[in-house]
Every structure is written in structure tokens, then in C-alpha cells.
Amino acid sequence: MIEKLTIKRSRQKVIAYSVIIIWLMIVNIWLLNNYHLNSSTLTRHGNGDNLIDEDDDSSSSSEYSIYNELDTENYLGQQHQEEDVPNSQSTDNSLIKPTSPAKNSFKDDITIKILQKHLQKQQNNPKDIRTKDSHAEIYNQIFENHPQIDTILGNLNFNQRCQLFFQNLFIKDNNWILNVKDKKIKLENKNDFKFNDFKKSHLNEFKRQFKTMKKLLEPNKIIHNKDFDNSIEFQDFIKMKYEQFWNRTMTYEQKIVDSISILRIFNKCYLIEEATSTTTTKNNKQDFIKDQFKLVDGIRRASKKNPSLPKFKPTKQEQMVNFDNENLSPSILEHRVYPWLSFEYPVYERWTGKVQYQPPKMANYVKDGNQKTTKKTKYNNDKYLSSFFLNRLKQKCNGRGLVLSISDLHVDVTVRLIHLLRALNNRYPIQIVYYDNLSKETKEKIVTAAREVMSHVPKSFERVAKYFPDDYLDNDQGGLPKQEIWFINTYNVIHADYKLQFRGFANKFLATLFNSFDEFILLDADTVLTQSPSYFFNLPQYLETGTFFYKDRTTYETRPKSDSIFFEKLGPSVIDSVMFNIPIMTSYTLNRSFFKGLFHYMESGLVVLNRDMHYSSFLTMVQMNFFEPVNSRIHGDKEIFWLAMAINGKQNYYFDENYAAAVGVMTPDIERTKPDKTLHESKELCSPHPGHISHDDNSLVWLNSGFFYCGQNDKVKFVEEFKHKSRLKHLNTLEAFKTFYYSPLRIENAIIPPMDLDIWAANNEDEPAKGWFGDPRYCSGYMWCAYDKIGGKTKSGKNTRLEGKIINFDEQAQDLFNYYGDVWVGME
């Protein structure tokens, strides 16, 4: 009996303890949700949470002034900021000037290190291989004011972090703006970063300066260069000059880091969240914050810190900058970050002459079902997000199409491209994007090429007719399919103060941003497609990543290491990653040949892009193009496309694995014998056209420089080129030579040369030492010869042989190339 009572009482105790434990867990969960996760009673403003605690009496503006010296706490805090952060009110509306780093770097904080490791693991990036981590200077101010980093990372939700970042920009300078016209930001000489290079490059200049200085100090003394060449005083003078150069350069680079960081964080905070190929209904920002709160709580409990998370308390100055619609609407930030925008839409003009002032709905004009694209990201009736012009622009874009950026100078090749697109049975609309003006004559030529009856095709069609659908030549509809043409005038989208900033290559980025498609293929006017546009839209890698890029020739032009370091610095910092979930650069980007020293990496004559997945990167492209130190390190626009994505924290871009090939007809072996009259092991193909070969099946998908054998005929000096007679030996007369240049390129073969930046394939067998050789004697300098093998035995017996790839196109492919070439050139 006693045993039964004991067992019964034990069970009762277990039940009671269990109830108490469950009750305590519920209380803790309630506290976590209502205390730790919400550090104060917050007032909702649109889509952001105000950092001001309305229950905190100290937040009442009537109780104190930030200028009241008798308020000891406030006065000392302000004094501390003024001492540590100089030039707090900039007078030139430019970005914050670099300040000295905090004495105790916040990057060394254990919480930040653990959170970053966790993020890298989630992103399948176990090792950080970067050599530089450069953050926006404003973080120094934020973490000096809030040295207990856990109060930010363990308390503030995503919107509150955004507010905190931009509040501090206003505290630093109420007139801050991303000044893209700052001409002081420049690259003095990218090859001078090492002291010895700098000294060698400027030695004579410094001798003159030093001599002038000495004459001013000692006017009666005759000074010769030999008197001071090796003097300590002169060496110190050079070191001083180098230090000045270095400090100027670091200042300019930090301004660019600040500008790109602010842009990146604004886009992350206030633009509609971008889709991925595997978009779910999860709110990524909320998931990121919830996960981080749990980790911060776990870190505090596991460490010697007080497990109770301190409450976040904004500084008095932060409380003065209140983001609400009546005081400081966050949409004002859009004007500060994008001062070059007029916040108007482009002018959209259909081929009929009808004009629209907002993006057209393409499904109303092209009714084949290809224009009914579904938005993966939506406003969800959020008036806050819709207050931003850039969000409205993104949401109004729709459908799929082709985009060209041209001027009147490009009308001839544009007409030829449109003829080719008709031959390729293209059904996608085409938008011609221009800046400022496109003449009436140019528009007439383009519309005529797109809409005229085109039922007569070259004789070469007979050999390929079987490869096209039965309705390919539908005479009732005007033969080859007519094209839906739109002209997009982007001049009015640029603020009047910045119109001169958009010339040349910048137009391509305007075309990227302001065409009206969700998905598009951006083309150069002289690009030649050998596959239909639908081929590119259906590439699996494009569907997965929202991009498809192609590589350039591997011409062994190199860049200094300082270039790679510079672009690394522009990427997201660790604190960007931890605060805003913007991933740092990984080996996916940093192991590319560009970062190892290759100068030409991407070819941008054909780019496939998805706006819904990469919109913020489009904006980063435009911003990067403003900076002279960026443009001085690349050729034209091409590298900015993929670099902008990596710098924006978006590394879901894709390159075809093949580098560009030379396409055409291989040089007969007998025409390039060795000095002893024996044949080379290597094969040679000389062509003015780089072509792009699919890694998947070795098919030719597109090529550059039009379809004339030589795309530079207006510049060619035919008499001089014909006299060389070292190539094209089958052409016996000047007239035949000239006719050949104006004929379509005939494509039978392609060569993708080998490439290894670490190997110069010198050899003793008269084989080429590098994969590409530019021959300036032909096609006005546009002739390049490619070799499938380079290197061989050296005098020491070493073998430097590297092998590339030869592609021999079958009869069907050659017949199609001939037909497309005849259409492009206009042959009967």
C-alpha cells in the first residue's frame, strides 16, 4: 500500500514539474518574441519599423537639444563623434570622406565572425579566399555609437537596420548624395601601385621638381642632377610623392566603395526582393533575421557574456532622423542614391508611330503566348514599395524580346540584322533603344526592313528549306515573318544635370535598364545569330540563373594585380553580409581568369538577361560606369555586366565554358610551312570574326563583326593590303581581293586556342608560342589567327605543348551558315 502511494506521489511530482517546465518555456518564448525580438514598442510606417521607442521619455524632442552643452551625456557623445569622425558636414554634397578606422575594429567581434561563418556555410562557401574586405565608412560611425554589436544584430529587424544605416548618413551629412560627377575620382596610373614602378615612371619628372625646389631654397647654388640622384634627401622626396599618390588613390577608392555600398544597401532595403530560379513563398529577409536572432541568442548563452540581450537604444541624433511619410519619406532616399534619374519613363514608340509614355504590354501586340510572363515577385498591394519609381518601372516591364542600342551610324548593320532575324524565323518583338535622337530616315529604314514583304530568298535556301517549318515562307503574311519594332527614347529619363554622363558605352546600360522586357537578349548591331532567339531563352543555364554570358578571345593581354584587388574591394564586405545578407565574393568569381590577370574575359555582343532576377545588378552596372577608375581598367562595357553582379552580391551568373573561337576556313597546310619546308603540327585559322561555340554540343551560336568577310571595309586600304600576298593567296587580282572582302564569310571550321596564363609556350620547333596572333596587315587590323596547338620542345628538352580544340562543321551547318550569310549580305 505504501509502495503504491509512493509511486502515485512520484507521478504527481513528475506531472507538476512537467507543467512548470512547459509554463517556463511558454514564458521564455513569449519574452523572446515580445522583448528580445522587439526591443521597443515600435510604430509601423509603411514597410519600415521606426527605431524610436515611443514609451521612452527620453525620446521626446521637447526634453533636450542635441546642441545643449549642459546635457552632459549628449554633449560628450557629440564631442566624441566630432573628434573621431572629421568633416561631419560636407560642403560639396559628395560622399563621406574617409576616416581613420575604429581603434577596436568591429570586424574582430566574435559574434560577427560566427554569423559570417554561418552565412558562408549556408551559401556553400566554406572558405573566404578574398584578399581585401573594404566596408563603407559609415559603419565606423554606427558601431562607435553602438559598440555592443549584439544589440543591433540580436534586436533589429531588417527594416530597422536599413533605417539605422541611412539615419547615420543623414547625421553625417544632411546633404549627402551619390555624386557621380565627381571628377576628382580618377585612376592616375594603374601600373604605378608598386613603389619601384612608380619611381621608374616618374623619375625624370621628380628630378625636375626637386631641382626647382632646391633652387628656390638655395638660389645662388648651381645644382646638377648628379648632385642629388642618390642623395637621401632626393630619395625621401620620391617616397613623399609616392605616399601622396597612394593616399590620393586610397581616398578615391574609398569614395567608390562608399558609393557602391550605399547603392547596394539601398537596393537590398527598398527594391522589391528579386526572384531566383527556385523562388518559394518564404520571405528571405524575415528568415535571415529570425535565423540570426537565434544564433545571437545562442552565442550569448554559450559565451561568458550576460545571456540577457541588452536592449537596442538609438542615439539622440538617430532619434532626430525619423523615417515617416510626414517627416522623411524613405522614397527621398531614391533621389539621393539616383540623382541622375529624372524619375520619368522613357518614350516608347511603336513602328506605327503610336507613342506611349509607360512600358507597353507586349501581349497586346504579339499574341503567340510568348509574352505572357508571370511575375515571380509582386507588390502584394504594398503602397510603401510602390512609392519608389524603380519598383514601379520593374513591375511594369513584361514579356520577352530582343534589345539593340544604336545610333544613326549603325543603321546599315541593323537593317541587315533584322533581315537575318526574319530568316531565323524570329517571333519576339525588337526594341531599338537610343539616347537623344534617332533620325526619321533611320527609323524608316528599320521599319521597312522589318515590315516589307520578304518572300524572295537567296538561292542557297534551296539546300536548307527542309530544315524550316512548312509556313516559313507564308506569302499571305508577307513571306518571312514581319517583326514587331519599338523605338525607345531614353533621353528624358536622365536628369538634366547628368545628360552629358551618358555617351558611348553607357547607352548599352540604359538599354539594359529601360527596355520594357522582363527577359531579353541584348545585341550589338553587328552581332550575327546562327541560332534562333528562342534557342537562347531556352538554355537550361539561363533558366536556372537568369543570365547567359560568353567569353572573349584569350589574347594574352594581361592586367596588373592591383586591378583584381580594386574590384575585390568593391564587393560586399563581411559587415554587409552580416547586417543585410549580401553575400561576399566567392571562388566562383575570384578564380576566374579575369582575377588572375586576363585583360579580356567577357564578350558582350550577345547577353541574355532576366530582369526579375537581376534588376538591382542592372542599376549597379550604370553606377559602376560613372567611375573613371572602373572604366580605365576594362575595355568598353563588357566586363561590367558580370562584375556588377558579383559586386552586387549576386553570383548566380553563368558563362559558357568555351572561350571565343576563330571561325571561317582553315589555312591550307602548304601555305604555312616551316623554314625547312616541313609542315607544322598546329593548324591555323585566320578570320576577322570571333565566334562562340556551345560547350554542350560544339555548335556555332553567334559571331561578331557582321557577315561580310571583313567588317571594316570602309576603312580598308585595299591596294596596300593586297600587296602583302602573305594570306588569301588564292586571290590573284585586286578586284577579286576586294570582292572577297565584301562577300559573306564562309564557315567550315572553328579553332578555340589553348590558354594558360602561367605558361608562355616558347619552343624550338617553329610552332606558335601563343594561341592568338593579330595580323594588322589585313582587314584594317581586325584579322586574328588562331592555333589549335601551341608550344613544343625547347632547347633544354622541356615540352611546352598545349592543345586547344578544332571544330569541323557538318554539311547541314555549313549550308545554314551560307544561307544566313547570303541573307545578311543581301545576295540573290
From Swiss-Prot:
The biological pathway it contributes to is:
Protein modification; protein glycosylation
Q: List the ranges whose topology is Lumenal.
A: 35-828
Residue ranges with Polar residues bias: 86-103
Name the glycosylated positions: N38, N247, N437, N591
Q: Please give the name of this protein.
A: Putative alpha-1,3-mannosyltransferase MNN12
Would I find rRNA-binding among this entry's keywords?
A: no
Segments on the Cytoplasmic side according to the record's topology features: 1-13
